[in-house]
């Protein structure tokens, strides 16, 4: 795609906090997380719910959530029954793919205003048992839907952590290099939290507790005070034969959260007196060998930047999802990026990685960082389980 004379723009962007596994958001149904951000982005954009053409959200772990959880989130946010709502599933890239689909829908004239984003409550993902034909005798094993549907490669039957180990070996990313990336992510996020840099992008979530409703408004996954000495003591988790380098500390987390943006054409924003956060310049998606899925952002970023008519040097800020430190280091190394331009507020290693929400979460953070720093050009990108990558170029005027 190309921006054209009347580009698609983002007029508001927000996210919930990112909750730890079985943490602050664990009891909040995923559709309620979605409703929370949908309400907020519409409020910020001063768009009436009935003016929305369509709602598109990424969502991965849908088992047991009821019929069309995104439709539930849409209606729960006050959007009328007459407005369609649906989900897309591209594992880690789902939340950004939803934004791409919104851009396409608006671009061809099918929609005028779209709410796009992603949501996930990994804490509520169920264990599954196949009992349709009954169990004649013996035990019935349970399948963890997080592992089965989210974190296990279907082609090589291996955990995503093994694909990170494969990238580390092929791109010669040492354990020390990975731990340095992880500590930097934690330290940057700690600094950003203390400086209030995330405050504007976060919408508080009301959580029911024994003491009544409480307002949750601070990301709870980051570990303040992280240092290389403590991190280097952790043992590799996925390969335990002495060759492993990926640990729980240099990998992203299992998390809960939601994020959303409101999109429309520039002419529609002008008519409504809205100042866009950015315009969508280009986007790209690619496929790669699944066993090294983490390198997906490399060709995706190259393609998106080329479509935009930019060079990598033209980009002010990159938000590249930190699924694993090994992957982040390999991407920066292969593309020759300036580390000072990449994930400057920290990334998923510190903040967390709620699968279906992460694609839009990094876009929301990118938009607010560009605004706060007065920068113009940004790229959001993610690697995707199953061997894919997705990237988007945005520009502030």
Curated annotation (Swiss-Prot):
Listed EC numbers: 2.3.1.9
GO cellular component assignments: cytoplasm; cytosol; extracellular exosome
Enzyme class: transferase
PROSITE patterns according to UniProt: THIOLASE_2, THIOLASE_3
Alphabetical keyword list: Acetylation, Acyltransferase, Cytoplasm, Transferase
List of residues binding CoA: 223, 226, 252
UniProt-listed SUPFAM superfamilies: Thiolase-like (SSF53901)
Listed InterPro entries: Thiolase, Thiolase-like, Thiolase_AS, Thiolase_C, Thiolase_CS, Thiolase_N
Site positions for Increases nucleophilicity of active site Cys: 353
Reactions mediated catalytically: 2 acetyl-CoA = acetoacetyl-CoA + CoA
UniProt modified residues of type N-acetylmethionine: 1
Top-level taxon in the UniProt lineage: Eukaryota
GO molecular-function terms, A-Z: acetyl-CoA C-acetyltransferase activity
Catalytic residue positions: 92 (acyl-thioester intermediate), 383 (proton donor/acceptor)
Pfam families, alphabetized: Thiolase_C (PF02803), Thiolase_N (PF00108)
Subunit structure: Homotetramer.
Its biological purpose: Involved in the biosynthetic pathway of cholesterol.
Protein name (database record): Acetyl-CoA acetyltransferase, cytosolic
């Amino acid at each position: 795609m190309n921006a054209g004379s009347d580009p698609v723009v983002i007029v508001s962007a927000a996210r919930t906090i990112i909750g730890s596994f079985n943490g602050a958001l664990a009891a909040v149904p995923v559709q309620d997380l979605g409703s929370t951000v949908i309400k907020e982005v519409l409020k910020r954009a001063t768009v009436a719910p009935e003016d929305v053409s369509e709602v598109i959200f990424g969502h991965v772990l849908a088992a047991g959530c009821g019929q069309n959880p995104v439709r539930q989130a849409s209606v729960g946010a006050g959007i009328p029954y007459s407005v369609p709502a649906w989900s897309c599933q591209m594992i880690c890239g789902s939340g950004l793919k939803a934004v791409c689909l919104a851009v396409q829908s608006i671009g061809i004239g099918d929609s005028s205003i779209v709410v796009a984003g992603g949501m996930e409550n990994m804490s509520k993902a169920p264990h599954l048992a196949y009992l349709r034909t009954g169990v004649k005798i013996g035990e019935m094993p349970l399948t963890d839907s997080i592992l089965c549907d989210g974190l296990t490669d279907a082609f090589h039957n291996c955990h995503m952590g093994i694909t990170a180990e494969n990238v580390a070996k092929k791109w010669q990313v040492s354990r020390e290099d990975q731990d340095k990336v992880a500590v930097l992510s934690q330290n940057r996020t700690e600094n950003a939290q203390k400086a209030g840099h995330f405050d504007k992008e976060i919408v508080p979530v009301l959580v029911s507790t024994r003491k009544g409703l409480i307002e949750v408004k601070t990301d709870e996954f980051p570990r303040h005070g992280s240092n290389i000495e403590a991190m280097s003591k952790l043992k590799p988790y996925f390969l335990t034969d002495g060759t492993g380098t990926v640990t729980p500390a240099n990998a992203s987390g299992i998390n809960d959260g939601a994020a959303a943006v409101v999109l429309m054409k520039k002419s529609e924003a002008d008519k409504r007196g809205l100042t866009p956060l950015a315009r969508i310049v280009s986007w790209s998606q690619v496929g790669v060998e699944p066993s090294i899925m983490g390198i997906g952002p490399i060709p995706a970023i190259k393609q998106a930047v080329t479509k935009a008519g930019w060079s990598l040097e033209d980009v002010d800020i990159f938000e590249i999802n930190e699924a694993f430190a090994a992957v982040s280091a390999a991407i920066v190394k292969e593309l020759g990026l300036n580390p000072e331009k990449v994930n400057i507020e920290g990334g998923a290693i510190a903040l967390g990685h709620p699968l279906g929400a992460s694609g839009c979460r990094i876009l929301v953070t990118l938009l607010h960082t560009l605004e706060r720093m007065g920068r113009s050009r940004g790229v959001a990108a993610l690697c995707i389980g199953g061997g894919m990558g997705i990237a988007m170029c945005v520009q502030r005027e």
